[in-house]
């Protein structure tokens, strides 16, 4: 193993305790996902406490649309991570380099396309979801600004996925922590000092996302390893892209279909007015945090399986999958019990409006029954 691999503490999961590898690799991923989730959640916290329930409903009404697209590309990034971790595990440096270049090139192209399309269709998507007239202008404003900077989110997710695939979970976590703190500061600054409302939290989010993306690209560019990003070599290798899509597309479609169903539910929630929308928004934010441990275990298992398949140890890869499923089940049941008891206190973090609290607690407790699935 090279000097830089030792310095970055790259994790070779092809030997040693499976449980220990998964837990130790999951912890930094969990914190990273926590910081990632803070972006939109902080937006809701700030507008809910400093602007009003209509602004909270506006931000919340966009979540399912954003997630539908972002989760699709997150699924594709899982495919890229599996391919890269396989080449890393098999020490195929040439293929590793090509996989990195292909991943980044595709990300840039998708970011540009998604930005253009998203800004244009954002108002129409919200109208299709029957967003109330008193919320629609704020929702459209937030969503269009968000789409304007979505490339930063995609680049960070793909770039940090590359680093995690070769065992570097520390720096993506540090970068995301830095940008999350930046987002909180900018949220409060734009909303309280400049009274920018919903637009302020949207701008704070995309500025912070571009900061984290720039840091990840800098690390990949400055690396001396074969996963280094060489701009002049940036291209799409068709065979590698096919491998990425064969794994990533099913994962992306699965995740985006779930988000699509949430968007469908959101359209019915919108019929009941801004208080119900705000209560649903509070529930979804909490639900997204609750799912983070299981999501992080899944990401750790992806890298574990990828490296062991690259090392041609299928039996160990299967054992790792079973261990990950067991850990996820235990954690989900524990968190469901805690949230059932403390549901009102968690909803009150976002809003103290009695109607919002009533709806939020109802949604949270109903959905806890299905968390383990």
Regions found by a protein language model. Name each.
Residues 180-214, 343-345, 358:
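Membrane-interface helix-loop junctions in multi-pass transport and translocation proteins
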Residues 34, 38-56, 126-133, 189-196, ...:
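Helix-terminus/linker motif at the lipid-water interface of multi-pass membrane proteins
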Residues 56-116, 153-172, 279-343:
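Small-residue-rich hydrophobic transmembrane alpha-helices
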Residues 51-64, 139, 143, 202, ...:
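Small-residue hotspots at the loop-to-helix junctions and early N-terminal turns
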Residues 1-24, 205, 214-258:
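Interhelical loop/hinge segments that connect adjacent transmembrane helices in multipass membrane
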Residues 113-144, 334-357, 361:
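Short membrane-interface helical motifs at transmembrane helix boundaries
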Residues 133-156, 288, 294, 354-373:
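Alpha-helical transmembrane segments of multi-pass membrane proteins
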Residues 20-81, 85, 249-269:
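Signature of the first transmembrane helix
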């Amino acid at each position: 193993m090279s000097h830089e691999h030792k310095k970055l503490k790259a994790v070779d999961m092809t030997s040693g305790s499976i449980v220990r590898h998964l837990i130790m690799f999951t912890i930094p991923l969990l914190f990273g996902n926590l910081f990632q989730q803070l972006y939109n959640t902080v937006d809701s916290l700030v507008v809910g406490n400093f602007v009003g329930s209509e602004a909270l409903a506006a931000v919340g009404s966009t979540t399912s649309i954003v997630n539908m697209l972002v989760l699709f590309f997150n699924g594709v990034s899982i495919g890229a991570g599996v391919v890269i971790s396989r080449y890393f595990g098999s020490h195929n440096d040439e293929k590793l380099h090509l996989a990195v270049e292909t991943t980044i090139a595709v990300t840039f192209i998708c970011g540009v396309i998604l930005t253009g399309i998203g800004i244009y269709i954002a108002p129409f998507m919200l109208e299709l979801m029957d967003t109330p007239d008193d919320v629609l202008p704020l929702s459209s404003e937030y969503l269009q600004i968000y789409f304007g900077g979505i490339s930063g989110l995609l680049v960070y997710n793909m770039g940090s996925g590359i680093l995690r695939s070769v065992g570097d979970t520390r720096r993506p976590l540090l970068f995301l922590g830095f940008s999350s703190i930046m987002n909180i500061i900018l949220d409060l600054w734009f909303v309280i000092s400049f009274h920018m409302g919903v637009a302020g939290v949207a701008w704070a989010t995309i500025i912070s996302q571009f900061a984290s993306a720039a840091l990840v690209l800098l690390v990949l560019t400055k690396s001396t390893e074969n996963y280094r990003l060489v701009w002049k070599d940036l291209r799409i290798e068709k065979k590698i892209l096919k491998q990425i899509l064969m794994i990533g597309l099913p994962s992306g479609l699965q995740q985006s279909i779930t988000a699509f169903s949430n968007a469908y539910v959101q359209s019915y929630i919108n019929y009941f007015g801004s208080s119900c929308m705000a209560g649903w928004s509070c529930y979804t934010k909490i639900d997204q945090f609750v799912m983070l441990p299981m999501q992080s275990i899944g990401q750790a298992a992806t890298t574990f399986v990828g490296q062991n398949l690259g090392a041609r140890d299928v039996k160990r890869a299967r054992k790792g999958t079973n261990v990950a499923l067991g850990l996820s089940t235990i954690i989900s049941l524990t968190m469901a019990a805690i949230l059932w008891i403390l549901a009102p206190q968690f909803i009150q973090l976002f809003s103290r409006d009695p109607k919002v609290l009533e709806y939020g607690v109802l949604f949270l407790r109903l959905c806890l029954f299905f968390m383990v699935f």
